[in-house]
C-alpha cells in the first residue's frame, strides 16, 4: 500500500510586488497555515518518506515551513515540472517515485491538484490554498498507479487547524 499526499501551496501574497508569478511569496495567513499543516502532520504521524515540490517560491516555502513547524524531515526534490503540470504529468512524476518510499508528499498548485484527486479517486473537490489530501493506493510500486485506483483517505483544509475546529492538543 502506498499513500500519496498532495499539498496545495498555502495562501500567497498577490500584492508582494514579485516580478513573476513563479516568485510570488506566501502571505502571512499562508505562513500560519503552512506551519499548522506541518504540526498536524507531525501529531498525526502523516510524515512522508520523500517530498517533491514545485519550484515556485510559494510551494517551496509551504513545504519548508511545514517541515520546520512539524519538526520532521525527509528527502526533498524540487522541480519546475510541477509548476504548470497537468494531472497526467503529475501521475508521471508519481510513477517515477522510488518503491522504497511508502508515503510521498507532492506540493503544488490548483487546478492541477483537484484534477489529480479526481483522476485517482473520482472525487471532485476544490482544494483551497494550504489543503492537505491523502490518497491511499493499493499498489506495491508507484509505477503501477493508474487513474481510478486511489481511495480518498482524508482532506484537511488549513482552516480546520487555524480556527480551532480541530484540536491537536
Language-model region placement:
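Active-site-proximal alpha-helix that buttresses catalytic centers in soluble enzyme cores
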Residues: 2-3, 7-80, 85, 89, ...
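Short, flexible active-site-adjacent loop segments at beta-strand->alpha-helix junctions, enriched
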Residues: 10, 57, 82, 110-111, ...
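Short, glycine- and charge-enriched coil/turn segments that flank and shape catalytic ligand pockets
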Residues: 18, 100, 144-146
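A generic structural signal for short beta-strands and their flanking turns/coil linkers
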Residues: 22, 74, 102, 129-131, ...
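Non-DNA-binding regulatory cores of transcription-related proteins
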Residues: 96-131, 136-139
Amino acid at each position: 500500500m502506498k499513500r500519496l499526499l498532495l499539498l496545495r501551496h498555502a495562501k500567497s501574497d498577490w500584492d508582494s510586488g514579485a516580478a513573476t508569478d513563479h516568485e510570488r511569496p506566501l502571505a502571512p495567513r499562508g505562513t500560519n497555515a503552512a506551519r499548522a499543516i506541518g504540526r498536524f502532520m507531525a501529531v498525526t504521524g502523516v510524515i512522508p518518506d520523500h517530498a517533491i515540490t514545485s519550484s515556485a517560491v510559494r510551494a517551496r516555502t509551504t513545504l519548508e515551513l511545514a517541515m520546520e513547524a512539524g519538526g520532521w524531515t525527509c528527502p526533498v526534490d524540487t522541480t519546475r515540472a510541477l509548476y504548470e503540470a497537468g494531472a497526467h504529468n503529475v501521475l508521471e512524476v508519481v510513477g517515477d517515485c522510488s518503491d522504497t518510499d511508502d508515503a510521498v508528499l507532492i506540493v503544488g498548485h490548483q487546478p492541477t491538484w483537484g484534477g489529480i484527486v479526481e483522476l485517482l479517486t473520482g472525487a471532485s473537490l476544490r482544494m483551497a490554498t494550504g489543503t492537505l489530501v491523502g490518497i491511499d493506493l493499493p499498489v506495491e510500486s508507484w509505477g503501477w498507479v493508474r487513474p481510478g485506483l486511489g481511495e480518498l483517505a482524508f482532506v484537511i483544509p488549513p482552516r480546520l487547524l487555524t480556527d480551532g475546529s480541530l484540536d491537536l492538543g
